[in-house]
Every structure is written in structure tokens, then in C-alpha cells.
């Protein structure tokens, strides 16, 4: 089973949990803009450099992320109490993070996962996140059953491309400011 099939299986499970049709996401993920990244995090050289993060705290922009991480560790997720906890690697498994687009789609019934990477002490870290995203023209609007009179839609309708591009623009706004200075 390829990684895209695993993502599709997870999306189908999520629709069942929300009480909507099982194949809701199938057509929306034809010709997707999914991305696989290969990431190297250099090691920390001293224990006191724990603040030197490999990746600062963030949430993923898209729907779901399937993350393969090597045995080095370093991934942390923020729990509901706001504490950072280790997400240790488990051989043969993937970490699943929900992203901001899925939070919008589900009207925050599913929340995006805040996470960060603390570079391991003395060893390189490698990870391979697969960001499962729909077709760029897919409308991102509140899913059926995720809104009612007491819980109206929280977000305006957008498309996958518009949403991702706006998030990238926000993330890299500092570059525009530097260029204008």
C-alpha cells in the first residue's frame, strides 16, 4: 500500500467518525497537490543547546500529514494542557498530524496538531513527512454535519490553492518586508 493510499484510508475513517459519506474525500483528492519532503536536522552539540530547535512550534497547513521519522527522535507535540511531550519513533509506524485545512473543513471538530522538533543531541535526525492535500480547486467549506444552529460555520469558503497560498504568504511575509527595507 502506497503512502497516498494510507492517507485515503485515514480520510475515509475520519468521514465515518463525522457521520458523513465514506467516499466524501475520494474525488477531492484526485490529482492532489500532496507533497513528500525529505528533511535533515543537524545534531545539537551540547545539552544546553536544547532551545536550538530543528523546527519551531507550528501546525501544518493542509489536511493530514503522515510522518516517518528515524530512530533519533526529537519530535514533540503539544497536548491539550499546553505541555510539550515527546512523540518517540515507533518502528514501522507513522505519526499522523491533522492540519489547519482539516480544522477548517471540520469546523474545528478536528484540530490541527501543534508540534516542533528539538534536534537530537549528537546525532543527525531524518524525517519524511507526506502532506496529503486535495486538488487545488477543491472547495474548503464546512463539512456536512459539522455545523448547526448552535455551531455555525467558523470559516469562510475558500479553495485548497487559495488557502495554502495565503498561509505561505503569511509565513514568508518577513521576506517581503526585508526586500522593501
Feature map (PLM): residue ranges:
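C-terminal flanking tails of non-heme Fe-dependent oxygenases
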Residues: 4-181
